[in-house]
Amino acid sequence: MKSIQVQQLVEEFNLEVLAGEDHRERTITKSRTHRPGLEFIGYFDFFPMERVQILGKKEINYLHQLNEQERDIRIGNVVNYHPPCFIVTSDQDGLTYLKKYCHAEQIPLLRTKEATVDFMAKVDHYLTRKLAPEIAVHGVCMNVLGIGILIRGESGVGKSELAHTLLGRGHRLVADDIVVLKRLSHKTILGTHNDKNKEFLALRSVGLLNVVRAYGSRAFQDETRISLDIKLSKWEKDSLHNELEFETQYRDYMGVSVPSIEIQLQPGRDVAGLIEAAANNWYLQQQGYSAAEDFMNRIEWQDGDD
């Protein structure tokens, strides 16, 4: 199971540490945050104690209104579950009683100036990406016409050279050689780099190329949702490819099915143009249009007239 430390949240969101400063190595394993409103009134049946606990104005105002004895009971009941950390939003103060309990139980108490809803959305987004299951695959990841494409193929087939051609046509590189795939949901795969290969494209006979330095910041994109899987293969004379085939092929990545096509390479073929055509065709299919079905309907209609 993937995890991050509370300290990484502190650094990412510039959080103020109010208590538990020596325990920021506590681990976070869940990608969603939680506001413990029901728990403060004593309902713990579905308390997700493994999540980061967010205390907004509603929670803090409720605690302020309680008498000291009742407040100690309510806070103690929640803190005793030992969540990874508590984060107070909207720069709220008057938190002496929270500091006392968090210090005693060695739980970091943090604070941000941001509003609750906006802050939770940012933290959820960050944790989802950090804690998502991931694999590394050999290939190139590009954003073509706003569509994330994973390009695969044997070593030396020309993936990086193709990526360079696509860059020249105004598209964006995400990762070359090693592509990190993250499963964000049951139907979403995110493609990104591994930090080491960020912005770099390896071209045979040329060497490493920093695409941002060479072509500007618009040549690079940090991540993209993978919508198409394209395999480059060597030309096979006797292979059969039916342009009128209706059935879409898929490739599985961590339980997510991604539409997949194969492009056979041959001298003189405009492979970059075929990639653009595949991206455009995928977009039309998402709008409910199939060129193959449209063509066959026309044939049937004309045959019926005859």
Curated annotation (Swiss-Prot):
Q: Which InterPro entries match?
A: HPr(Ser)_kin/Pase, Hpr_kin/Pase_C, Hpr_kin/Pase_Hpr_N, P-loop_NTPase, Ser_kin/Pase_Hpr-like_N_sf, Sigma_54_int_dom_ATP-bd_1
Keyword Transmembrane helix included in the entry's annotation = no
rRNA-binding among keywords: no
SUPFAM superfamilies on file: HprK N-terminal domain-like (SSF75138), PEP carboxykinase-like (SSF53795)
User: What are its E.C. numbers?
Assistant: 2.7.11.-, 2.7.4.-
Query: What reaction is this protein's catalytic activity?
Result: [HPr protein]-L-serine + ATP = [HPr protein]-O-phospho-L-serine + ADP + H(+); [HPr protein]-O-phospho-L-serine + phosphate + H(+) = [HPr protein]-L-serine + diphosphate
The protein here is known as: Putative HPr kinase/phosphorylase 2
Natural source organism: Oceanobacillus iheyensis (strain DSM 14371 / CIP 107618 / JCM 11309 / KCTC 3954 / HTE831)
Q: What is the lineage of its organism?
A: Bacteria, Bacillati, Bacillota, Bacilli, Bacillales
Gene assigned in the entry: hprK2
